[in-house]
Swiss-Prot record:
Residues 1-17 form the signal peptide. GO terms for biological process: Gram-negative-bacterium-type cell outer membrane assembly; protein insertion into membrane. One of its GO terms (cellular component) is Bam protein complex. A lipid is attached at residue 18 (S-diacylglycerol cysteine). Pfam families: BamE (PF04355). The gene is bamE. It is a lipid-anchor. Part of the outer membrane protein assembly complex, which is involved in assembly and insertion of beta-barrel proteins into the outer membrane. The lineage of its organism: Bacteria, Pseudomonadati, Pseudomonadota, Betaproteobacteria, Neisseriales. It comes from Neisseria meningitidis serogroup B (strain ATCC BAA-335 / MC58). This is Outer membrane protein assembly factor BamE.
Amino acid sequence: MNKTLILALSALLGLAACSAERVSLFPSYKLKIIQGNELEPRAVAALRPGMTKDQVLLLLGSPILRDAFHTDRWDYTFNTSRNGIIKERSNLTVYFENGVLVRTEGDVLQNAAEALKDRQNTDKP
């Protein structure tokens, strides 16, 4: 009787460990993963056509992507994710012609303008 009871309890305990529902009840720590270049709103707002690559490099830092086939295009990307789910994503693409900045694209431009406007409103007495 004792051996049968111990064997049955061991089997139930082993099978209980296989339950996915029970495991999900216990929270686990998930790292917040930050990848890419987090660009300062003032630095993005300071970009002007006619700037050299060196000036842009000093202002924004090294780009995440420098395409070997499109050397006149730099991509700055920023992602924040937790548990494999992206919480925040922003992109900025900078285009050059003959080593001079000609245009920029990306959602960072609008976010930078809004952030600067908010800062100016909060700085006023």
